Amino acid sequence: MKNLISLGVFLLILLSVQVNAQEQSVLKIRPTGRILMDGGLFHSDNKNFVDGVAIPDARIGVKATYGKYKAKVDIGYAYGKVSLKDIFVERQFSSHALLRVGNFVHQFGLQSSTSSSMKVTMEEPASNEAFFNSRLMGAMFVYDKNDFFGTASVHVESEALKKKSNELGKMGYGVMSHLVYRPLHDTGRLFQLGISGAYETPRYNSEPTLNHTSFDLGANFPTRIAKVRAVNALIPDAKNLIKFTPEMIAGYGPVALEAQYYYLQVNRKKDFKNYKASGMYGILRGLLIGGNYRYSHTDCGIATPDSGSLECVFGYNYTDMSDTRSHIYGGRLNDVSFTVNYYINKYMIWRFRYSYTKITDRVGFENQSLSAFQTRFQVIF
């Protein structure tokens, strides 16, 4: 932990150099925001799924640039709660390298490059929710040039944004990296291979016997209108967590494929068996209207289609959080989905999604399924 603090101080000093050279720069500020409006019809034996409408995410924020520096502050509102989202400062060292410090989503696989509102499947794959981290306080170095993209991050656990260090009792930390090779990144011709890896120490838990000796991992059913846990694994007596995820993008003309595999292992104390979990998803995309797919270097993935584009997306996700060797049964999830995206203009998107989700082998939870019809109108600026 002391090493991480020392590294953080060094990074802040690094960000502050050459300020005198920036004196002639102009400060530019622009507002940002988003509104998501959802509606859904559900069919399931689980009575927690009730048809309805919702505004699951509304945000307002500001972006600022000053010479080689950029900053962002984003505040969100959902279901009566206000929360802090992106809060960071970054410094551009060249056209290919930057350093970002603050609270933000660190790079780990394909899904980390797009915000929650820009998922082409409307909701992110369950495997990504189960095995990925949300925003974390830390620092990330980014290198982006030609065929290569790479990041390196150090961070503390997510609860560090919500609680003081004496309330946490201890502060978990971790490191992660995302490496990509993309020999084809032209309009209509896309191919990318990548791999991400991460290491974490145990996280905060409100139960004293589990605090910083456990990991609580899981994912909800793919809807934000009703919040229902689909798979969940509590792993006690934990020493650390390691995970990795290979990824692939391939596209030709108006058709593209995205795929990712996840492997996670929690190393445990004493004679307890290590916990292992895995997952994968595949997404097949096609533009019925809108020309060919383009590449986005900033997102390290497929760019958002142009205004007026109409897109169809087929998705499949499998998540396995039940490990017989460690006797921890978090459940197994299968999900198939079909999504239509209409990109109305630069700021507005309409989505329609049908999905079928089946859960099995979760301790204390009956095998069950959910059929869901959902639609979303979103405004982002």
Give residue spans per PLM region.
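Bacterial Sec-dependent N-terminal signal peptides
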Residues: 1-24
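Short hydrophobic/aromatic segments of transmembrane alpha-helices and their interfaces
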Residues: 3-4, 54, 131-132, 331-332, ...
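Short, Lys/Arg-rich amphipathic segments at extreme N-termini
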Residues: 13, 58, 62, 378-379
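Hydrophobic alpha-helical membrane context
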Residues: 14-15, 69, 365
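Outer membrane beta-barrel
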Residues: 23-160, 166-203, 286-288, 298-304, ...
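Outer-membrane beta-barrel pore domains
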Residues: 46-47, 209-381
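A short, polar/proline- and glycine-enriched secondary-structure boundary/capping micro-motif
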Residues: 83, 111-112, 162, 268-271, ...
